[in-house]
Amino acid sequence: MEINKVFFKTRFLKYLISSGMLFANTINAHRISAATQENIDIPKVISYRSASCGCCKKWINHLRDNGLEVVDNIVEDVSAIKIQYPIPNNLRSCHSAQIANYTIEGHVPIESINKLFIEKPNINGIAVPGMPLGSPGMEIHSHESHSHDYESYKVVSFSKTGKTKIFDKISP
């Protein structure tokens, strides 16, 4: 009987701690997201994509829905843009953008862009390699999809010399 009490007290304590951590992380993510319109001055986004890419258009809408002004440039050769703004080969995705002096590559969420302009690190840009399911522009909207089907993914920072490091971690 005594072992049962200890087990449940320990389990309850772990639950309280994890709930508090989840709450704190949720509040922090909300602060960064809400800061876009209130405190962060993010310049106009200059986006480059091919005409045939639908997910790129959805990513642009994600930025616009979060208050950013986006110039949508449809280009014949997206790879030329990736060379012009030296994006490491292993980080390349379907679309690129410039915001002030930063390059944004792939399906980077608004929260990471906000973080970039809050911290203002000395980097060339940030990227989401590939096309993770659930990232902005890669959402599935149907009665069968659930957020738990989405992937966790990393936003990677990169320098002009190609040095990379984890900038942000995104979980569904």
Task: For every predicted segment, state its role.
Residues 34-36:
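N-terminal, intrinsically disordered, polar/charged segments of Gram-positive cell-envelope systems
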Residues 84, 90-172:
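Thiol/selenol-based redox catalytic cores and closely related redox-interacting motifs
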Residues 38-60:
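Local sequence-structure signature of Cys/Sec-based thiol-disulfide redox active-site neighborhoods
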Residues 7-16:
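N-terminal export leaders
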Residues 55-100:
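N-terminal, post-signal-peptide region of Sec/Tat-exported proteins
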Residues 22-30:
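C-terminal segment of classical bacterial N-terminal signal peptides
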